[in-house]
Amino acid sequence: MISLRFQPSTTAGVLSASVSRAGFIKRCGSTKPGRVGRFVTMATAASPLEICVKASITTPNKLGDCPFCQKVLLTMEEKNVPYDMKMVDLSNKPEWFLKISPEGKVPVVKFDEKWVPDSDVITQALEEKYPEPPLATPPEKASVGSKIFSTFVGFLKSKDSGDGTEQVLLDELTTFNDYIKDNGPFINGEKISAADLSLAPKLYHMKIALGHYKNWSVPDSLPFVKSYMENVFSRESFTNTRAETEDVIAGWRPKVMG
């Protein structure tokens, strides 16, 4: 198990084992060009939340390809909540993990000494405990784009080019394109919200998996879908928490080949 500690507000983190390292925290990876790295001491940082996430199956010590884990991490990043990320090999789940997550599922987050599963429950708890900045999506907008993921999976798994699954996906994307055209740039207008943080990782998987396995991409006739994806994928919170392309491809392989 690898533990990575992050302080989103300072873009800083530390690689650790079972014992936390004192001193400075620095996010793993390179700093952006022209940007000076900033550091905070452990003593002045807020106590990080512990979160168990899927580990990469292609690269040691990297975040894996779970879109639901990324949804929670995006929420923490956007709210500047520091977190201690524990990467779990889901193909060989350790005993300590099964004790806190008997079903063996990720993500799970520790709130007040209690481990909480389910990305929807976790993000709601984060909204209640860390209300600023507010990320809740109004109920009437919360389901926008919610059918895209299932239709993407249906098309990805399809082995019959004439079964209509591609058109079903295109219909959902067209509906979303028209919505963003009239209401964007995000689902709740000018500011990103929980619905975007849920949808963005799924669109990322759609882009990579369909590009690799179907040689398919969002058509130019849906410019607002494409601009939406560019907007969310380019956010620092997203680049900090996205899976490697190779992991997304490997993660979907069993569903495609099965």
Swiss-Prot record:
Its main location: plastid. The keyword Oxidoreductase applies. Residues 56-129 form the GST N-terminal domain. L-ascorbate binds at residues 54, 65, 255. It comes from the Eukaryota. The active site is at residue 66. GO terms for biological process: acquisition of seed longevity; ascorbate glutathione cycle; L-ascorbic acid metabolic process; protein glutathionylation. It catalyses: RX + glutathione = an S-substituted glutathione + a halide anion + H(+); L-dehydroascorbate + 2 glutathione = glutathione disulfide + L-ascorbate. Monomer. Interacts with TRX3. This is Glutathione S-transferase DHAR3, chloroplastic. It comes from Arabidopsis thaliana.
